[in-house]
Amino acid sequence: MAVNLKGRSFLTLKDFTPAEIRYLLDLSHDLKAKKRAGILGDSLKGKNVVLLFEKTSTRTRCAFECGAAEEGAHVTFLTNSQMGKKESIEDTAKVLGRMYDGIEFRGFKQSTVEELAKHAGVPVWNGLTDADHPTQILADFLTIEEHAHKPLSEIKLVFTGDTRNNMSYALMYGAAKMGMHFVALGPDSLKPDEDILKEMQEYSKETGATIEFSSNVDEAVKGADVIYTDIWVSMGEDESLYPERVKLLTPYKVTREMMNKTGNKNTLFMHCLPSFHDEDTEVCKDMMDRLGLDIREVEDEVFRSKNSVVFDEAENRMHTIKAVMVATAGR
């Protein structure tokens, strides 16, 4: 059956079938190949796209702006909206839906992007919330397919760190849909929500995926195709969380030793970025000096190794986001 996503919002991978996700990945591969051949499309010619940002961004903003422009769209970047302050989310959605053909939202609450989608009348795309990050997962899966050279259904992906964060959940949703073996690796006190685990395990019955949690590094990483991590305190979280968080998560830091424990010399290291892997950022250096803690979630050696595909992931944000826009709002 042909896949048609015209007019659909992209809020979470939970809303999409494996066939629909496969379609978006195939379209991403195609658009990337055309871009490299110097062929740009015009699927969004004459269309207007607005980007709503509550949280700062490098990759998400650049990916949406470049992707939209390369397909012919006009883009508005909006950071000073009155949404939720002097104007309700519903009213803002209705106004923007009259002027724009697609709306991207990057912010805090998942309920905000859902409310926008409910009332806008045009596709709404989730650029990140505290609960989910679906565009990142498409980029991750595209990157895995390019480097692992086997189907996603044969991939074992281990997310190590705070397994309650949006990246852990987003990867879990994608893995469940695509029949992958996903392990959330971290301390018991930072275990994923039990209801979400059960929900994903239900999805897995249909796709053959395996979704599990482990606090044992040696067992969890054995045979892994991918080791994935994220910073230990997310955007918007209080800095005071660091001392206890670092104490809990240091055993789950991605090190050369952890990579070796996979028993797979080709294990990929992945990270959604930004990353604390050295002291070359003001924030990381300042916090390490003030707190007297090593807050880096990955060793610099691993981050810069041949196994690291983090910058391929970053590039692939653009190709996959372009695919989402073309598929849902294109001509």
Curated annotation (Swiss-Prot):
Binding site for carbamoyl phosphate: 57-60, 82, 106, 133-136, 272-273, 317
Domain of life of the source: Bacteria
Localization, UniProt: Cytoplasm
One record GO biological process: arginine catabolic process to ornithine
Keywords, ordered alphabetically: Arginine metabolism, Cytoplasm, Transferase
EC nos: 2.1.3.3
Pfam families in the cross-refs: OTCace (PF00185), OTCace_N (PF02729)
Catalyzed chemical reaction(s): carbamoyl phosphate + L-ornithine = L-citrulline + phosphate + H(+)
Residues that bind L-ornithine: 166, 230, 234-235
Job description of the protein: Reversibly catalyzes the transfer of the carbamoyl group from carbamoyl phosphate (CP) to the N(epsilon) atom of ornithine (ORN) to produce L-citrulline.
Family: Belongs to the aspartate/ornithine carbamoyltransferase superfamily. OTCase family.
Protein name: Ornithine carbamoyltransferase, catabolic
